[in-house]
């Protein structure tokens, strides 16, 4: 007898509920990655935030 696998049912049900959160999390991650990848060492040297947090 084949055992019932609950994971496909669980993921299908949870995807309907959680897709807005997961999509927003992915978009936010992509934006943060793109913005931080564009920073240079010169930008860091001139940044007040970096200067305050550098020890």
Curated annotation (Swiss-Prot):
<dbReference type="GO" id="GO:0009414">
    <property type="term" value="P:response to water deprivation"/>
</dbReference>
<dbReference type="GO" id="GO:0045259">
    <property type="term" value="C:proton-transporting ATP synthase complex"/>
</dbReference>
<feature type="transit peptide" description="Mitochondrion">
    <location>
        <begin position="1"/>
        <end position="11"/>
    </location>
</feature>
<dbReference type="GO" id="GO:0010555">
    <property type="term" value="P:response to mannitol"/>
</dbReference>
<keyword id="KW-0809">Transit peptide</keyword>
<dbReference type="GO" id="GO:0042542">
    <property type="term" value="P:response to hydrogen peroxide"/>
</dbReference>
<protein>
    <recommendedName>
        <fullName>ATP synthase small subunit 6-A, mitochondrial</fullName>
    </recommendedName>
</protein>
<dbReference type="GO" id="GO:0009409">
    <property type="term" value="P:response to cold"/>
</dbReference>
<keyword id="KW-0138">CF(0)</keyword>
<comment type="function">
    <text>Mitochondrial membrane ATP synthase (F(1)F(0) ATP synthase or Complex V) produces ATP from ADP in the presence of a proton gradient across the membrane which is generated by electron transport complexes of the respiratory chain. F-type ATPases consist of two structural domains, F(1) - containing the extramembraneous catalytic core and F(0) - containing the membrane proton channel, linked together by a central stalk and a peripheral stalk. During catalysis, ATP synthesis in the catalytic domain of F(1) is coupled via a rotary mechanism of the central stalk subunits to proton translocation.</text>
</comment>
<dbReference type="GO" id="GO:1902600">
    <property type="term" value="P:proton transmembrane transport"/>
</dbReference>
<dbReference type="InterPro" id="IPR052867">
    <property type="entry name" value="ATP_Synthase_Subunit_6"/>
</dbReference>
<keyword id="KW-0375">Hydrogen ion transport</keyword>
<keyword id="KW-0812">Transmembrane</keyword>
<dbReference type="GO" id="GO:0005743">
    <property type="term" value="C:mitochondrial inner membrane"/>
</dbReference>
<dbReference type="GO" id="GO:0009744">
    <property type="term" value="P:response to sucrose"/>
</dbReference>
<keyword id="KW-0406">Ion transport</keyword>
<keyword id="KW-0496">Mitochondrion</keyword>
<dbReference type="GO" id="GO:0006979">
    <property type="term" value="P:response to oxidative stress"/>
</dbReference>
<dbReference type="GO" id="GO:1902074">
    <property type="term" value="P:response to salt"/>
</dbReference>
<keyword id="KW-0346">Stress response</keyword>
<feature type="transmembrane region" description="Helical">
    <location>
        <begin position="21"/>
        <end position="39"/>
    </location>
</feature>
<keyword id="KW-0999">Mitochondrion inner membrane</keyword>
<keyword id="KW-1133">Transmembrane helix</keyword>
<keyword id="KW-0813">Transport</keyword>
<comment type="similarity">
    <text>Belongs to the ATPase 6 subunit family.</text>
</comment>
<keyword id="KW-0472">Membrane</keyword>
């Amino acid at each position: 007898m084949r055992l019932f696998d609950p994971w496909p049912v669980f993921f299908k049900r949870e995807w309907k509920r959680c897709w807005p959160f997961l999509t927003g999390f992915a978009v936010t991650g992509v934006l943060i990655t793109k913005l931080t990848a564009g920073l240079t060492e010169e930008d860091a040297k001139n940044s007040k935030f970096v200067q305050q947090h550098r020890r």
